[in-house]
């Protein structure tokens, strides 16, 4: 953590992944954010990293953070949710409402804004999906996602080919 968020070098790296928001390369991969700080900013940085990997199609887990005064090593119980997720079949994964909503927003943008994204999403079959892959999505999340998609799809005008 640097000045309450990610360091400049990490921010620069994350900025270079901007196209991944449109053509996510890490779909279905679990990510364990790790944060260290001298004092404050751990929670905000963890949230920032979790949001960034959500853009990539990954699913962030509860991260592990340490401050300078907390030098205890990472314990197995802290890693267990991540280890379980590594072995979880995709069909049993349950995305959050945020992930379902973000997927639908990405889908509308892919289908309406840029030809390169439209082709990518259609090749993956995501243009007809409720989420990147078949998984456990509650009825409420599924309906909210479909409603959001329908509203945005009607409102966003196609912007040509680029």
Which stretches of residues belong to each language-model region?
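Helix-loop-strand module that forms the ligand-binding subsite of alpha/beta enzymes
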Residues: 1-59, 130, 135, 139
């Amino acid at each position: 953590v640097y000045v309450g968020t990610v360091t400049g070098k990490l921010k620069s790296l994350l900025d270079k992944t901007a196209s991944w928001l449109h053509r996510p390369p890490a779909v279905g991969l679990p990510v364990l954010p790790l944060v260290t700080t001298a004092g404050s900013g751990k929670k905000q940085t963890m949230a920032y990293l979790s949001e960034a990997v959500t853009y990539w199609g990954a699913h962030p887990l509860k991260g592990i953070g340490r401050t300078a005064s907390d030098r205890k090593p990472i314990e197995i119980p802290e890693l267990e949710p991540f280890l379980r997720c590594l072995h979880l079949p995709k069909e049993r994964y349950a995305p959050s409402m945020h992930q379902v909503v973000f997927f639908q927003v990405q889908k509308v943008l892919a289908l309406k804004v840029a030809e390169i994204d439209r082709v990518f999403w259609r090749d993956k079959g995501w243009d007809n999906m409720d989420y990147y892959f078949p998984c456990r999505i509650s009825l409420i999340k599924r309906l909210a996602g479909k409603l959001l998609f329908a509203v945005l799809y009607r409102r966003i005008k196609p912007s040509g080919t680029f």
